[in-house]
Amino acid sequence: MASTSDAPHAMAKRYFDDLVLREKSESRWFSADETEMIEFARKFDPQYFHIDPDKAKSSPFGQIVASGTYTFAIWNKLNMEVNGDIAWIAGLGFNDFKFPNPFLPNTPIQSTSHLISKRESKKNPERGLVIHEYKVTDENDGTIFECTCPALVARVTE
């Protein structure tokens, strides 16, 4: 019977050795209306171009745009819908964290993940290190958010 030292991940379907280098996955499409973006920003990022449609018209964006924090939260939700079955132990940070274009109200976005690196842990044989490249794009293939993320993933041990 297979087991892992990371009991919370016992129900996960994909462990380190199940992950295929260069595998890609895509989320469903998602869009949010202006009201949802404003409600979030009022609580967590109350800058005028996130919360006030009239003042936002004079911003560099010319309209309401989603908070980067909101965009990141939506990315995480979409990513977990396609990669939530991985036996994650911990994320180790984010590299090249960018928001090259704003997330606009009622604009469909999609998250993609690409496994660009994987290796067994040098310190602990019960885990591996992976690096995913993540990107959120709109329907015109414009990049809304991107980053790379190293993370530890459980390995199945006997």
Indicate where each model-derived feature is located:
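HotDog/MaoC-like acyl-thioester-processing domains
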Residues: 2-21, 99-108, 112-158
